[in-house]
Amino acid sequence: MKLLLASQSPRRKELLQCLGFPFEVVSIHCDESYPSQLPICEVAAYLSLKKANSYTHLRSGEILLTADTIVSCSGQILGKPRDKQEAAQMLKKLSGNTHEVYTGITLKTSTKTTTLTDKAEVEFMPISSEEIDFYINEFKPLDKAGSYGIQDWIGMAKINKISGSYYTIMGLPTHLIYKELNKLTK
């Protein structure tokens, strides 16, 4: 079986490499809208499946892996920020609070589709305006849901507690992928 990763995320590429499965990166183009009435806990899985279904080149003997990560704080989804100002607003919202991170994955073959979601909770200590400005200017988190990467400075300095998989927060629930890929490749 040939594994195809449909993601441009350097973090997802790195994590999948660490699992030891050889893979090839493929591009997909998919509108990332979702129904507004969809429960927050289902959005990441919905988008992951939507991405998988938008890939039309899947052949027999191939496994397509897609993923989507969302951050939810106080019932509001925090996606990727449009600019530095929106990133600062998101980080202020996360400061001193606990939020949820949902990562949905889809593994698709020519005959089977499996979609799973993993949830983690993250508790931030208070983050000052100066720390927010430093983080945004030095680490450029505009490509990350919720405007932060747990593996960055802000994760090391300002996260008080996590519940769930660290790798789910990074954007790829490696434990689920390992289990499912082993099922598909045996």
Task: Label the model's feature ranges.
Residues 11, 31-33, 113:
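Surface-exposed, flexible loop/turn segments at secondary-structure boundaries
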Residues 2-4, 39-186:
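Anionic-ligand binding patches
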Residues 2-21:
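N-terminal beta1-alpha1 ligand-phosphate binding loop
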Residues 24-34:
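A short beta-strand-loop structural module common to alpha/beta enzyme folds
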Residues 14-18, 35-36, 57-58:
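Short loop/helix-cap segments at secondary-structure boundaries that form the rim of catalytic
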Residues 8, 28, 110:
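Cofactor-binding loop segments of dinucleotide-utilizing enzymes, especially the Rossmann-like FAD-
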Residues 17-19, 33, 97-98, 171:
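Short acidic/polar alpha-helix capping motifs at helix-coil junctions
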Residues 22-24, 125:
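Compositionally biased, low-structure terminal segments
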